[in-house]
Structures are given as C-alpha cells and as structure tokens.
C-alpha cells in the first residue's frame, strides 16, 4: 500500500465533479489551523502525466489553497475501480413531483425507452418513472440535464444520499436513482470541460484504502526539505500493514 502513495503536481490533476465554495472554505480553515492532512485524496492515472481525483477533491483543492504545489494521493489502478451511482432520497412533495412532470428540459416517461439511457429513475410510492434528455441520448447533454434535475431540489429540499442496497419502497419519500457511467464517459465529459453535480457518481474500490493517515502540511509543501519526516511516515505505515 505504501507504494501507491505519490506526490502529484497540482497542475497534473483534474476533477470530475463540481464543489461547494463554502464547504471548501471551511476545510481550508480547518486544515490551515491543524496543519495536517488526514488521509490523502484518491486518484487514478488516466494519462502519462494526468490524474483524475476520484475521492477527496476538497482535500486536494484545500492543499493547493494552502500553497502546496504538489498533493499527496493514493493512486489506484483502474482495474480495481467499480463505478456505480448514488440514490437521492427526499420527503415526498407533490409540488416537486409536478416540477419534474411539467419541466421542458427533459422527457418524463412512465416507460423505460429502449436504446435510450435515462438520466434519472424515479421511485414514487409503487411506481417508477424515467427522465430522459429529450430522447436524443447525446453524451454532451448529460451534465446540463443532471444540473437541471438537481436544481429542482438540491437547495430547497434536504436529500439523503444512499446506495442501491439501502433502498426500500416508502410512500413518504421520493427516491431518485442516477445511471451508471463508464470511466470513458466520465473522462469524455471532463475533457469537454463539464463537471458532474456532486453525489451522482459513486466509486467502489476493490483495494485496501488508507485509513487515519496524518501528514503534516509542511511535509507536503516541501517534501525535499522534510524528506526524513516523510520517510518516517512511510515506515510507520509499512509497519501498520
């Protein structure tokens, strides 16, 4: 596991999803006060000099804001990654349901359409509905549609993020299930300058993840000057495995 930890130049990393400024600011202040990074972000190498951050985007961004030219990251092999999606569950609200049904940004259907990828599978009581991007199926239309869907409830209604295995039918809730995207689809969208809304894509790692690893910010900021301290951190990690 030690060999999976690397220093990566911040200008060599890219992100796949958007972020909230207030949450980032809170983390910057917290990390700045404690002067510690708890657990490095997780990334996958997608080109010889480019890495996609899969988990820990706020930590990666905060390190940059704290004057770190490089970030520490746990690098995982693409073969060890399974891509799924999150479900959003929120209290049933008839006004919200009408917003979905009457919105012209997408096609609302009670039937699953053959050869078309739905953008949301919606569970309302014992019925299932599907939202499509106007039947076109263009990958470039995915992000605007997902943003349009989440704008209907993200700020005004509190939702709970759950996994598929946790879902049970409940007449008091609306549950939205997002589709799965391949790594290639995600990279294609990112290369077009598009970012997913938060809490859509879910990564499952079939590899041991670093837990409770604490790295001083000054070591990350100046690894050459603190080479001895960095070696101590790696030695402790190696002994704990």
Language model: regions and residue ranges:
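Phosphate- and divalent-cation-binding pockets in alpha/beta enzyme and binding domains
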Residues: 61-62, 185
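Long, contiguous hydrophobic alpha-helical segments, chiefly transmembrane helices and signal peptides
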Residues: 53-54, 186
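Alpha-helix capping/helix-boundary segments
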Residues: 58-59, 182
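Helix N-cap/beta->alpha junction signal
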Residues: 55-56, 179
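Active-site-adjacent beta-strand anchor residues
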Residues: 52-53, 176
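Solvent-exposed functional surfaces
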Residues: 69-71, 75-241
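Short alpha-helix boundary/capping and kink motifs at helix termini
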Residues: 1-52, 58, 64, 68-70, ...
């Amino acid at each position: 596991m030690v060999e999976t930890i690397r220093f990566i130049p911040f200008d060599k990393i890219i992100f796949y999803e958007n972020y909230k400024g207030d949450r980032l600011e809170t983390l910057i202040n917290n990390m700045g006060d404690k002067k510690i990074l708890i657990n490095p972000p997780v990334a996958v190498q997608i080109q010889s000099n480019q890495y996609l951050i899969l988990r820990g985007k706020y930590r990666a961004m905060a390190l940059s804001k704290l004057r770190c030219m490089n970030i520490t990251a746990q690098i995982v092999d693409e073969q060890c990654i399974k891509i799924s999606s999150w479900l959003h569950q929120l209290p049933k609200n008839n006004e919200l349901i009408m917003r979905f049904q009457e919105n012209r940004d997408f096609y609302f259907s009670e039937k699953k359409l053959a050869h078309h990828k739905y953008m949301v599978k919606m569970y309302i009581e014992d019925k299932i509905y599907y939202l499509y991007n106007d039947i076109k199926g263009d990958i470039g239309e995915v992000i605007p549609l997902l943003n349009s869907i989440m704008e209907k409830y993200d700020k005004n209604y509190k939702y709970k993020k759950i996994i598929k295995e946790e879902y049970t039918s409940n007449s008091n809730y609306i549950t939205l299930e997002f589709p799965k995207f391949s790594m290639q689809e995600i990279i294609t969208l990112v290369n077009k300058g598009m970012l997913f809304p938060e809490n859509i894509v879910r990564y499952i790692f079939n590899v041991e993840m670093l837990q409770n690893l604490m790295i001083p910010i000054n070591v990350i900021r100046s690894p050459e000057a603190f080479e001895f301290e960095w070696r101590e951190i790696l030695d402790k990690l190696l002994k704990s495995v």
